[in-house]
């Protein structure tokens, strides 16, 4: 693979990651799906778009917390209709410990955990995003919605086009 092709792929991946982060920042709620086919809308807190860790506050005694303890993998779906942008993320999910809950806690969460018992049983789901599927009008290849653009994080943490990416999608990105 030529150095120019690598640089072009890096630029394309950076552009796609920026568009995905922008989409997520515009969406107040997303769907969180566990392997047990349980899904529910969740308000999200994205720590830093560069590290692709997303957190949610939840009760440690909830069904979704139990699902995460059992499976440790989840999917997240974000949809921003005004910009015709759709982002599906998958990754490893963990429940953070008490000291991390204290560090991340904000007074705004008290309304969802009104009693001391509720607050003691609060935790954060932390998702380390490993893969993403993107459909973002004006960013992913045309014709819009017919091909999925997939990115995957390698062992070093670098984002690349997924091996499962359709060749047509990748070549369309290369031609621009």
Regions found by a protein language model. Give the residues of each.
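A short, Trp-centered hydrophobic/proline-enriched beta-strand micro-motif
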Residues: 22-36, 74-78
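Histidine- and/or cysteine-centered catalytic micro-motif in compact active-site loops
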Residues: 35, 59-61, 79-81, 89-94
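Charged, amphipathic alpha-helical segments
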Residues: 13-17, 58-62, 110
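Charged, gly/pro-rich active-site loop segments
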Residues: 1-12, 88-176
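Positively charged, polar, low-complexity stretches
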Residues: 39-41
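Short solvent-exposed loop/turn micro-motifs enriched in small/polar/acidic residues
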Residues: 25, 37, 86, 117-120
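A short mixed-secondary-structure module that forms the rim of ligand-binding clefts
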Residues: 45-83
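Short, basic/aromatic recognition patches
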Residues: 9-29
